[in-house]
Amino acid sequence: DSISLVQSYFYLTGFAGKELSEDAFATMDTYFNKLRESGKKAVLRFAYETAFMGRAGTGPTLEDVLRHMEQLKPFLAQNTDVIQVVQAGFIGAWGEWHSSFHGLEKTNDSKRTILEKIVWMTPKNRMVQVRVPEYKNLINKEDQSYNRISFHDDFIVIKPHQWDGGMHE
């Protein structure tokens, strides 16, 4: 037995307001090649911000996020073999969908737009994970992409909490 899945975060912090650079793609490509060489796959998340509770100094606009997803789509398609799943990041602290500098998590319209674009950019043979169960319901249940959305829990749910999606024990 050996490690086969790696939680992988790519922080796009320096790219708010501009295009992703060739150097950024070269760095990600080097990382994916190392995963490929070692027989591992990524649980992949993109994020911009690493602070919360009003401490982030800057963050992406909705337009930044959507533009970067346009750039990332062909790159993810080229690296599908080393991607196990894509987590719906991009918004707020650590891509956890809270505390974003521009308040991207504050309206269902912006969350829905971002989630639909994440599903769009993710290769069709890969699932997308959301952190809170009700985020899946931002997508119309009749939409084929609805069945490609699952969830992950990166905190232990032991008591009722505003972010637990009603899943507390």
Language model feature labels by segment:
Residues 1, 23, 29, 64, ...:
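Acidic-enriched, low-complexity/disordered segments with a strong bias for Aspartate over Glutamate
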Residues 1-4, 169:
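Short intrinsically disordered, low-complexity coil segments enriched in acidic
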Residues 3-50, 61-65, 122-126:
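Aromatic-lined substrate-binding rim segments of carbohydrate-active enzymes
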Residues 15-18, 51-57, 94-98, 137-140:
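Extracytoplasmic/secreted cell-surface and envelope-processing proteins
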Residues 21-31, 62-72, 105-117:
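Well-ordered, non-membrane alpha-helical segments in soluble/globular domains
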Residues 34, 38, 71-79, 117-121:
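Alpha-helical structural signal in soluble globular domains
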Residues 43-53, 72-105:
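Active-site groove signature of glycoside hydrolases
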Residues 85-87, 92, 96, 100-169:
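Catalytic-core regions of glycoside hydrolase
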